Amino acid sequence: MNTHNLLFSFIILFFSCGLKQKLNYSSEFIIPDQKFNNNEVRIDLDYNDEKNWAFRSDMHDFNRLIPKNYNIKNEKKINVSVFFIHPTTLFSSKKWNADTSHFLNNNIIDLCLENQASVFAGITDLYVPHYREMHIYSYTDTINGIKAFNVAYNDIEASFKYFLKNKKTDKFIIASHSQGTNHAKKLINEYIYPKVDLRSKLLMSYLIGMDINKNEMLIDLCQNPVQLNCFLNWRSFNESYY
């Protein structure tokens, strides 16, 4: 394996959400072989269309997300809505962004929801949008990658606007992982923070799987277990993972 492929394989390991059992890392992944083409992603996604949601509490059964041996009946429901942005699942494609066919019967997206968004399932008003995420290779080829990132972010912002209009509670939480955290950072800093009333309703932000310097965020870093209106951030690996 040459240096380029080795770096790409490391990036996949670095940004995946516990997918070691689902992916064959010894295989050669397909990466974009053309420059980013905006003509391929000109049409905006309609978040009134249920197909553009990976999970929504008002249309999906939360039991599909929780561990099969876990009894959620005794859990107290929390009066809060959650907007969860899932991590990268586009590893092998010639396109810089996922298209809507990527949303269909996607076991990797399902696994990410089961491993991560499940903590909110059944006890909150949970929204998880599909979005035209950027290819994992965008972290290597950043010239084309930033353009792909902007497409993905525009979907996130559009879905968040739908979330704001339809969520069942006043207060809300932002939660994200990996690429999702890249989008959450931008959403909080550029869309939520400038709106004082909206900012006051952001109860907590769980920005996981990416390094974040506290100076990168306009909201405060949480300093104690009971602080609200702040963000938590961590990135952890098993010992000797890489």
Positions of the model-derived regions?
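A general structural signal for short secondary-structure junctions and capping/turn motifs
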Residues: 2, 72-75, 117-120, 195-197, ...
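Bacterial Sec-dependent N-terminal signal peptides
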Residues: 1-22
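Hydrolases whose catalytic domains are alpha/beta-hydrolase-1, hotdog thioesterase
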Residues: 183-187
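Flexible, membrane-associating and regulatory peripheral segments of lipid-active enzymes
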Residues: 17-109, 113
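Surface cap/lid and interfacial helix-loop subdomains adjacent to catalytic sites
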Residues: 20, 157-168, 190-242
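Active-site catalytic motif of lipid deacylating hydrolases and related acyltransferases
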Residues: 34-36, 42, 85-171
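Gly/Ala-rich beta-loop-alpha elbow adjacent to hydrolase catalytic centers
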Residues: 176, 180
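Structural recognition of the beta-strand scaffold that forms the well-ordered cores
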Residues: 81-85, 127-130, 173, 204-207, ...
